[in-house]
Amino acid sequence: MSLHTPIRHCSDCGTAVVYRLPDDGDTHERAVCPACGRVHYQNPLNVVGTIPFLPDGRVLLCLRAIEPRRGKWTLPAGFMEMGETASQGAARETDEEAGAQIAMGPLFSLLSVPRVGQVHLYYRAELLSEQFDPGYETLEARLFAEHEVPWDELAFRTVKETLQLWFADRQRGQFGVHCVDIA
């Protein structure tokens, strides 16, 4: 089952591609141009974000203003852009979606979601202020203590998994890096 729209034409020369094993020993069928030989790859997309938190344990969530899952709560996150590191992308998304000032921390969770062709990376990020300026993708940015988190109103399973891990680590007093596969 393909997760992406199939590539139909070569981006270099415009010739219709054929799907086959490339001649370089690759083990996956790829879109190969029969005219110029270009091999076209379709790989998972990286989603990068933060867990913005205050020392008292409250976390910042954003109420989505866009689809998918408009009107649901999420951590600030989005697709990584070309030319930026994962942590730069996470900081950018936090600024764009929440207008939050943060001090970036280490990677906290890496979640593989193969059914949608994505890898999600969340970083710990201490909030430097309780002032937020949500962007156009966010209806509201609000701080939540663990018992206040709207668990049934979270937009994505990756967000729920990450928050559960973060609160568990905080309770233990030690943060790790978590790798999760989501079927």
Please identify what each model-predicted range represents.
Residues 73, 100, 142:
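Residues that recognize and position ribonucleotide moieties
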Residues 69-70, 145:
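Short, basic/glycine-rich phosphate-binding loops at helix/coil junctions
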Residues 22, 71, 153:
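Short glycine-/acidic-enriched loop or helix-start segments at secondary-structure transitions
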Residues 1-6, 135-183:
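Nudix hydrolase/Nudix homology domain
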Residues 74, 115, 134-137:
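Short glycine-enriched loop/turn motifs at secondary-structure junctions
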Residues 1-68, 79-96, 100-131, 172-183:
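N-terminal leader/linker segments that precede catalytic domains of diphosphate-processing enzymes
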Residues 72-78:
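Conserved acetyl-CoA binding element of GNAT-fold acetyltransferases
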Residues 68-69, 137:
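A short beta-loop-beta micro-motif enriched in histidine and acidic residues
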